Structures are given as C-alpha cells and as structure tokens.
C-alpha cells in the first residue's frame, strides 16, 4: 500500500503524521498491495478536515471528517472507511451466496431431468 500525505493551507507535525499513518496501516489487511492511499489535511475557519481516499483496481473508498481536533478527524475518517469496507464485503458475500444457490439449483434440476429420462 502506497501512502501520499497532502497538506492544504497548513503544516502538520510529525506526531500527527505518524498517528495518521499508523491508523491507516491497519486498513492494509483489507486491500491488496497495489492500492494507493491519499491522506489530505486541511483547515478552514478553525475546522480541521481529514480526507482519506483509498484507490484499488475496481474500488475507491473515500471518507472525510471535519472536527475541531485533527486527531478526532483522523479517527472519524478511519471508522467511516472501515464501515464502508464492511458494507462492501457483506454485499459481495451476499452476491456470491445467491449465485452459488442458483448454480446448485440448476445442477440439481439437470440431474433430476436426466434421472427420469
């Protein structure tokens, strides 16, 4: 997983940088090695915004969180991405289960017809 950190209209310290990277590295288990992650830090009118975008072949997951504390924004964006990943994973599992059932029903029907002939 490749990481890119973007700072808009502000500078972040090393503690925040390592905190964000450590949190985002936990998402590494959900994605393949060729995925790109962009973490954007920005500040507007006293509000701290963190935007995290993970790009992988066939999938883009994006989350943005705005609070008064940058660390809380990182935590909120990470939890939002984890929620999206769980939702996507559940959707894929349901699709695979439904497809598997249809294939089994077709095979069983074909076997039943052959037995009667």
Feature-to-residue mapping (PLM):
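N-terminal, polar/charged subdomain of small-to-medium soluble alpha/beta proteins
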Residues: 1-117
């Amino acid at each position: 997983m490749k990481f890119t950190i973007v700072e808009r209209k502000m500078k972040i310290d090393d503690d925040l940088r390592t905190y964000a990277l450590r949190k985002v590295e936990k998402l590494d288990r959900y994605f393949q090695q060729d995925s790109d992650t962009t973490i954007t830090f920005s500040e507007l009118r006293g509000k701290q915004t963190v935007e995290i975008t993970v790009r992988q072949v066939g999938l883009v997951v994006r989350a943005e969180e705005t609070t008064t504390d940058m660390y809380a924004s990182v935590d909120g964006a990470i939890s939002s991405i984890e929620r999206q990943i769980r939702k996507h994973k559940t959707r894929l599992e349901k699709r695979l289960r439904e497809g598997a059932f249809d294939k089994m029903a077709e095979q069983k029907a074909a076997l039943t017809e052959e037995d009667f002939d």
